[in-house]
Amino acid sequence: MPVLEPRAVIDTNEARCRDCYRCVRVCPVKAIRVVHGQASVDARRCLGCGTCVRECPQGAKRYRRDLPKAEALLKTRKFVAASLAPAFAGAFEPWALLRLPAALRRLGFHYVAETAVGAAWVAQASAGLARERKAPLICTACPAAVGYVEKYRPELVPRLLPLVSPMMAHARHVKARFGAEAGFVFIGSCVAKKAEAERPELAGLVDCVLTFEELADWLRDQGIDLGHCEESAFDEVPSGSARLFPVEGGSLATAGLASGPQDLGAAALSGFEALRDGLGMGQEGGVQLIEPLMCSHGCINGPGIRSEENIFDRRLRVLRFSQAPKSGPEAAATRADLSARYQACPPSPAMAFSEEQIRQVLEQTGKGRPENQLNCGACGYASCRDQVLAVLSGMAEREMCIPYMRRMAEQRSSLIMETSPNGIVILDRDLSILNANTAFEKLVHASSLSGQPISQYVDPDPFEQVASGQVALYDAPCRDEARGLSARLIAYPLPNEDRLAGIFVALPEPGEDARQLRRLKDETVLQARELQEQQVEMARQFANYLGQHTARGEQLVKKLIKAVESEAGPAEGSLGRP
């Protein structure tokens, strides 16, 4: 089966990405690549779980919106079905649940049913297969969990149930019942479903995947208020307990393999940590079936739900709805094919790095010694070694290490302080010297100043004014002939540090200002006299030239008139003059 390049379902709004690395910390498989401080999702590694979307404090991570695709489908297909995932009972208010079918029909859908219809069929098939196998089988309803096994736990692929998810089961049912040209739109809380719909072997079954958030936006844009919609029955409703699928243990209860925590025939895992640790369990206690859900507490906590409700309130809504009378005809057993195939597809060939390569990067970040490897996790990785491996594989940057960047900042600060030609001194609130650069030591003709009161070297009054809050910034000349000090002092408090800073800019020695001013005046007078002489000489030469030019011109005109008169004589018809 060919493995195609995956289409990204999650991307990054770079304008909002702020170097917090939270997405790196929460991503269960570290599918976030950081380049020049910008975090982006590597589609080959991504599970589409949407954890980064839900957790990003700046809203920089976003999943792909497919509303235009759904709208186009309604315009181009004669028949389009809407499949509503069972988590809708937790995503919407109880009074709105039976109004959703009418709202979806107003949007243009011809068939509206619960995806739990397909969940019931998958659960029944799962129970039958689980009883025939010795090793525990893994449910395949959660596409993020399936993707994790295929990409990162390939040894467990044989344990995956060879069954499609409820979404795909329902899609096959609709296509079989209404024809292959029927459109099928799935609406749920899961972002990973968008990627599942594009699996090559399942292409064409699900035409579009929307989240509950997208549905809410669509209804708002079309001016459809659920409060103004009538209650209406679904075209098909599920049998049994299939409405429990979106909560932890729901699929197992539907399959009849677990009715409570005392049952040992199945294991429900929700949240990545439980999923990671529990998928490889053996036959201990007679476990036949493992239900993995990537989102903690199940699909009612998916990233596509826009709800302020407490997660336990959502769960309670689902439980109550599962016990409510069914509103619509119950779906019969399907004749659609429920089989599926899964295969290992690691995101990329494993990259091996030598211990020397790892050691070099550790040393570059100041963590060459084991005691300097803090394993603080601020960068998003569990250990310094994991971060180094990510750096070497091109997924991370050295600058993501917060302790390393702090040391770099301190070193730059120290370098600036030591190379500054101005005297710089840092004081505590008691006006004792914490740090002073070489330029300040030269200014006060002393060394080894740390711990000494500033009053031993300069007048402390400016610093006392700043420390007491009398002035926020002191900026004035500071002269002390007895100490040989001549400088301009700029003193100010350091925010959030409870410290004071003083910068001494050297001034000319007393009397030097007057000497410089006198020298400048003398030079100015001299230059003015030279300019005056040049201007007078230029004027004289110009006048002389102009006079010579005028005299020569006058002589030339007289000669010209005389020549014309001597040659022409009196003109014809003219009156003679005496």
Predicted regions and their residues:
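Short, charged amphipathic alpha-helical "coupling" segments at sensory-output junctions
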Residues: 398, 402-419, 513-516, 520, ...
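PAS/PAS-like sensory domain cap-loop motif
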Residues: 440-450
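PAS-family sensory/regulatory modules and their coupling/dimerization elements
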Residues: 461-509
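Sensory coupling linkers of modular signal transduction proteins
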Residues: 493-538
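Signal-transducing coiled-coil/dimerization helices and immediately adjacent hinge/linker segments
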Residues: 520-578
